[in-house]
Curated annotation (Swiss-Prot):
<protein>
    <recommendedName>
        <fullName>Uroplakin-1b</fullName>
    </recommendedName>
</protein>
<keyword id="KW-0472">Membrane</keyword>
<comment type="subunit">
    <text>Heterodimer with uroplakin-3A (UPK3A) or uroplakin-3B (UPK3B).</text>
</comment>
<feature type="topological domain" description="Cytoplasmic">
    <location>
        <begin position="1"/>
        <end position="15"/>
    </location>
</feature>
<feature type="transmembrane region" description="Helical">
    <location>
        <begin position="61"/>
        <end position="81"/>
    </location>
</feature>
<dbReference type="GO" id="GO:0005198">
    <property type="term" value="F:structural molecule activity"/>
</dbReference>
<feature type="transmembrane region" description="Helical">
    <location>
        <begin position="230"/>
        <end position="250"/>
    </location>
</feature>
<comment type="similarity">
    <text>Belongs to the tetraspanin (TM4SF) family.</text>
</comment>
<keyword id="KW-0325">Glycoprotein</keyword>
<dbReference type="Pfam" id="PF00335">
    <property type="entry name" value="Tetraspanin"/>
</dbReference>
<dbReference type="InterPro" id="IPR018499">
    <property type="entry name" value="Tetraspanin/Peripherin"/>
</dbReference>
<keyword id="KW-0812">Transmembrane</keyword>
<feature type="transmembrane region" description="Helical">
    <location>
        <begin position="87"/>
        <end position="107"/>
    </location>
</feature>
<keyword id="KW-1133">Transmembrane helix</keyword>
<feature type="topological domain" description="Extracellular">
    <location>
        <begin position="108"/>
        <end position="229"/>
    </location>
</feature>
<feature type="topological domain" description="Cytoplasmic">
    <location>
        <begin position="251"/>
        <end position="260"/>
    </location>
</feature>
<feature type="topological domain" description="Cytoplasmic">
    <location>
        <begin position="82"/>
        <end position="86"/>
    </location>
</feature>
Length: 260
């Protein structure tokens, strides 16, 4: 392929542009996944206690893939500008490996969206919240994490339980085993607080008087951020894969026309 041909130059420009987009997407993917694994909403203890934190695994893969895509886009641009078959061959091999990792990340993140159900967090809350009799240290660690996370959620976001305060009444729980029903119909964090973070009217809260306890559940506050992150990791990654596929296809065609 003659390198001074204007058509070839135009095609090279398109491929370089395609790789620039891949590099920018790689940086964006890395930033998105770093934001996710930094756990801005402090919800990781709830996932850890389910023994299924694959969505975080998908995000860590996304960080690796994003960095690799940026580096490989630079390699691809150099190979295209120099019309080097060896550089482009290395680009293809490495890109296919990274592509496979990103496919795995997208599939993992997409399938996790159906995992965040109300029953999952309800069962976990009932079993682990204020459970002081775990079978081992690992469960104690998880119970403490779940308890602290729920205390913060209910106090900070003015909610109570997964579906509402009735969760603490309708179901058997470790909390109910540890506390008297009359004194603790639900955790103190479910009460409306004053500026000192003390119940505004404890007796009214215990009796369930409207305005003195929170009757909204916390499920949306838990599943919302998790689903958004899972959606972002999965579908932004999928969009990158689609774009990369066509850039790779065009680069392979260009590589096949380079003279030895």
């Amino acid at each position: 392929m003659a390198k001074d041909n204007s058509t070839v130059r135009c095609f090279q420009g398109l491929l370089i542009f395609g790789n620039v987009i891949i590099g920018c997407c790689g940086i964006a993917l890395t930033a998105e996944c770093i934001f996710f694994v930094s756990d801005q909403h402090s919800l990781y203890p709830l996932l850890e206690a389910t023994d299924n934190d694959d969505i975080y695994g998908a995000a860590w893969i996304g960080i690796f893939v994003g960095i690799c895509l940026f580096c490989l886009s630079v390699l691809g641009i150099v190979g295209i500008m120099k019309s080097s078959r060896k550089i482009l061959l290395a680009y293809f091999i490495l890109m296919f490996i990274v592509y496979a990792f990103e496919v795995a990340s997208c599939i993992t993140a997409a399938t996790q969206q159906d995992f965040f159900t109300p029953n999952l967090f309800l069962k976990q809350m009932l079993e682990r919240y204020q459970n002081n009799s775990p079978p081992n240290n690992d469960d104690q660690w998880k119970n403490n994490g779940v308890t602290k996370t729920w205390d913060r959620l209910m106090l900070q976001d003015n909610c109570c339980g997964v579906n509402g305060p009735s969760d603490w009444q309708k179901y058997t729980s470790a909390f109910r085993t540890e506390n008297n029903d009359a004194d603790y119909p639900w955790p103190r964090q479910c009460c409306v607080m004053n500026n000192l973070k003390e119940p505004l009217n404890l007796e009214a809260c215990k009796l369930g008087v409207p305005g003195f306890y929170h009757n909204q559940g916390c499920y949306e506050l838990i599943s919302g951020p998790m689903n958004r992150h899972a959606w972002g990791v999965a579908w932004f990654g999928f969009a990158i894969l689609c774009w990369t596929f066509w850039v790779l296809l065009g680069t392979m065609f260009y590589w096949s026309r380079i003279e030895y």
